[in-house]
Amino acid sequence: MTENRSKLNKELAQMLKGGVIMDVTSPEQAKIAEDAGACAVMALERIPADIRAAGGVSRMSDPKMIKGIQNAVSIPVMAKVRIGHFVEAQILEAIEIDYIDESEVLSPADDLNHIDKNKFNVPFVCGARDLGEALRRVAEGATMIRTKGEAGTGDIVQAVRHMRTMNSEIRRVVSLRQDELYVAAKDMQVPISLLQFVHDNGKLPVVNFAAGGVATPADAALMMQLGAEGVFVGSGIFKSGNPAKRAAAVVKAVTNYNNPSMLAELSEDLGEAMVGINADEISILMAERGK
């Protein structure tokens, strides 16, 4: 990927700021998401809650299914690949996907190495639990970061933890003296140039979205108030009682995240929320994958 292409990919990700990206498993769901105001959709054969329930090995979705969703909507379409599976990424780039999510939700293909995202023209989004993980993914070529949270649970606690951790580590880096940055870069195993950017600007070099456990308009607004620049919503929409209404409410909540009166209105009469899973009671944490 050339320097110009990298700059373009970062600018493309900037265009999604303030938006909601929704997991969808069919063209019909994709249309619901688009009509609700989603800025992009994530094409999946199974949403994270179903992946978690089924267990086993979870892989990239069928390209034919992804193409069906691409043909159904005019907004960007994303799709997930396994961590380290660069051939799945090559396939998605070949079908002209708009974004690739190298995702811990799927079973990792490589337990040591992530994809060298700099070799691709298509932009990548990756999950991170802290500043070190985020900057390592950016060094590999990611142009968007999201909290890992704990997908498929409807429990926001992990996403909150990851966002607060990242924010506190950014504040610490900003407070460092110039000569202390080198030690911090060594400890985090990240390039000094990326840590220098964080020190000078007080933020990541790429956009930072929230993901993992967002189930209500209040959850989405919480993550925005904590500093997220947008929100991914997975199982929380289409595992709920009224997906269309909940989807629209989450989109409006992200736009009006500092307006409690509006949030109260948006939270009314949404039907039953997804049945959640307490993240502390789970034996396999997806967020542990890919450091």
From Swiss-Prot:
Enumerate the residues binding D-glyceraldehyde 3-phosphate: R164
Query: What's the domain of life for this entry?
Result: Archaea
Database matches in PROSITE patterns: PDXS_SNZ_1, PDXS_SNZ_2
Q: In which pathway does it act?
A: Cofactor biosynthesis; pyridoxal 5'-phosphate biosynthesis
Give the binding site residues for D-ribose 5-phosphate. D23, G152, G213, G234, S235
Record-annotated active site: K80 (schiff-base intermediate with d-ribose 5-phosphate)
Gene Ontology biological-process annotations: amino acid metabolic process; pyridoxal phosphate biosynthetic process; pyridoxine biosynthetic process
Question: What CDD domains does this protein map onto?
Answer: pdxS
Q: Which InterPro entries match?
A: Aldolase_TIM, PdxS/SNZ, PdxS/SNZ_N, RibuloseP-bd_barrel
Q: What class of enzyme is it?
A: lyase
Query: Reaction catalysed?
Result: aldehydo-D-ribose 5-phosphate + D-glyceraldehyde 3-phosphate + L-glutamine = pyridoxal 5'-phosphate + L-glutamate + phosphate + 3 H2O + H(+)
Q: What is its EC number?
A: 4.3.3.6
Q: GO molecular function terms here? A: pyridoxal 5'-phosphate synthase (glutamine hydrolysing) activity
Assigned keywords, A-Z = Lyase, Pyridoxal phosphate, Schiff base
Entry keyword Cell membrane: no
Write out the similarity annotation: Belongs to the PdxS/SNZ family.
Subunit structure of this entry? Answer: In the presence of PdxT, forms a dodecamer of heterodimers.
Function, in words: Catalyzes the formation of pyridoxal 5'-phosphate from ribose 5-phosphate (RBP), glyceraldehyde 3-phosphate (G3P) and ammonia. The ammonia is provided by the PdxT subunit. Can also use ribulose 5-phosphate and dihydroxyacetone phosphate as substrates, resulting from enzyme-catalyzed isomerization of RBP and G3P, respectively.
Q: Which NCBIfam families match?
A: PRK04180.1 (NF003215), pyridoxal 5'-phosphate synthase lyase subunit PdxS (TIGR00343)
Please state what the protein is called: Pyridoxal 5'-phosphate synthase subunit PdxS
Q: Which gene does this sequence derive from?
A: pdxS
